[in-house]
Amino acid sequence: MLRIWGRINSTNVKKALWTARELNLDYEQIDVGGQFGGLKDPAYLARNPNGLIPLLEDGGTVLWESNTITRYLAAAYGKETLWIEDAAKRAQAEKWMDWASSSFYTNFSNVMKHLIRLPEAERNPALLEQSLQGLAQSMQIANEGLKEAPWFSGENFGIGDIPTGCYAYAWFEFPIERPSLPHLEDWYGRLKQRPAYQAAVMTPLT
């Protein structure tokens, strides 16, 4: 059985959990990180020297980096579903995976901290506003990316949709004003209909 290490409210862990659920894989989820600690334990660091989450164990295969885990699970278990055999089409999907990780992470982390996690007295309104503007710009790029195809993976849902899908849930749940992004909103509406997305991603923001 697969083992996925990481707290369920982590956006990066959600990628792994969502992928596993889309593929109907049996897995054990182990809480580490955040309030659970454990990331500096020698046994954990022996598996992931970065001391970060998620971590995947599949028999003798041990992987870290959330996008790598998503790719691995899709390639190993999703040949007829999430994985894209055509190299050029797969590269288009993977482009969006890597773009999401580099474009969203810093601004998203700041918003989570200064809108959700910190006590109000400790929040930095200027940094929050700057980060919200950055997220809005990234979401506009994502919106434009959906003008020519219904999914970031092309004509069908696939690996390219998973990273942005995890960030999009929080974006649409934040108590903020959002610009009109019709292509992104349509795509998000279809994501919300997927049972695996509901179970793995649509959890309370904490």
Task: Name each region found by the language model.
Residues 1-129, 143:
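GST-like domain detector, emphasizing the conserved glutathione-binding G-site
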Residues 34-35, 160, 205:
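Conserved beta-strand edge residues that scaffold enzyme active sites
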Residues 74, 167-168, 201:
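Active-site-flanking alpha-helical
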Residues 100-193:
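GST-like fold's C-terminal all-alpha helical module
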Residues 109, 201-204:
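Short coil/turn segments at secondary-structure boundaries
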Residues 117, 205-206:
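Carbohydrate-binding/catalytic loop surfaces
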Residues 193, 197-200:
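Charged phosphate-binding loop/patch that engages nucleotide di/tri-phosphates or the phosphate backbone
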